[in-house]
């Protein structure tokens, strides 16, 4: 998505067409096209489920992803396979990585069984994964006929991807790498920070930030100075002073106005914060979706309009019926997918009385939370609280996200949750550099005020900002 948006922006700004930029793409996309692969060649969610059944490891993989890591979920099979992908990305022996990770929840013998079944499945079925594409590109050692090479976010490239880059570097006269080793937070996908730092002796530091105000800059600078082995660099904040505010409790954060983004280390911690927002009736966005489903909100508005005497089109009525129970909201046989609606013209309007006589409506007049029975009690309570606050339900002012997902983003008000997962805290105590970089990224997302919340974890597992 990021590559597509960047390509569209460049074409618009420079008056180009997309076919003039055939190599403006991710490394995986480049390797995919160079290898002549088809989408059906790529190992799928169903394939992983089949492999998991054979070895007794459940998967919760996603149906789509831009990398092998993106595809994986959080089930046992995903955790095992993630370790194998990481070893390949880092170009190190699997047993060596297994010893380094020291994750005693992973059985070595079962890991070997999974890897054997995985590779055998790909071989027999003629399947590949995203890492195979890069490995094949490297094996063929066939550079592109290009004059210039621009590599963005280069600090996140894995050791294997740097091997692909070394092939791409064979022909172009102009070579530019952009990135920030202080923001190298993709170590869990094999990011090779040293390779980025050593990719060229000719370095230029962009010294002026156009986002980070002065007060948050002080926090950011303090964190980055803790990173051992970082490339020395001096940069300056904007002229705006901004502010840093500390909060002991979640409920103290003044969310009433303005744009907000809440950042946490893991999805589990994000979910805990999202539940707090929900309890307070705040509408928020997560994964690009509002916390109140738009169709449910449309059904509520449509019903309220119907109650006030307005007439509705067929699509609006079908949407209302989708949240009603049969024989309570509408007569059996008149559901939203019934024949009753098949041949109805979409632009014809029906009053509530007409719907009772022609479309099977049987719900008596009442408020939406009394008639839309398929919206559960807790959700009704949440929506009622949210509507009282009067926020824009379809375009929430508040976003919740992991720090990794927000990389590259910005917001006026950034809330940073310092809590760490047990695994991240264990790694933090052993090697803090990863968490320094992660929380440096978090605090530099703000354009105005940085809000720092006291730890919620009762066992002392948090990052010390």
Regions found by a protein language model. Give the residues of each.
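Short, polar/flexible loop-turn hinges at active-site or ligand-entry regions and domain interfaces
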Residues: 13-21, 36-50, 59, 144, ...
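Conserved helicase motor core of SF1/SF2 NTP-dependent helicases
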Residues: 4-5, 25, 148, 155-241, ...
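Conserved phosphoryl-transfer catalytic core
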Residues: 31, 42-68, 171-184, 200-209
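Conserved beta-strand -> loop -> alpha-helix junction used to position metal-binding or nucleic-acid-contacting
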Residues: 19-35, 282-308
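P-loop NTPase Walker
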Residues: 1-40, 221, 406, 444
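Conserved helicase C-terminal RecA-like lobe
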Residues: 304-453
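Accessory N-terminal region flanking or inserted into the helicase ATPase core
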Residues: 61-150, 159-164, 187
